[in-house]
C-alpha cells in the first residue's frame, strides 16, 4: 500500500482507505474520492501545491497534498494512455 500523493504522474491506483478525521473523509467521499474509486495522477503543482487527479467518473479534482498523504491506495498501474 502507498498513499495518493506518491502515485507517479500518468499512473492510476484504487483508493483502499481514507485515514482522515470523519469530517474530512466525508468531504472527500462527497466529491467522489472514496474506497474503490480509481484515481489517475495527472500532475502535482510545484512547491508543494495541490495534486491534479482524475477519478474513474472522469471528473478532475485538485487535492491538497496533506489530505492526499492520508489516502491509501493500492499499487499504481502502468502508465495510463493520454
Segments from the language model and where they lie:
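Short alpha-helix capping/helix-loop boundary micro-motifs
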Residues: 20-27
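Short, Lys/Arg- and Gly-enriched loop/turn segments at beta-strand edges
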Residues: 25, 46-54
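Short, compositionally biased
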Residues: 30-31, 51-63
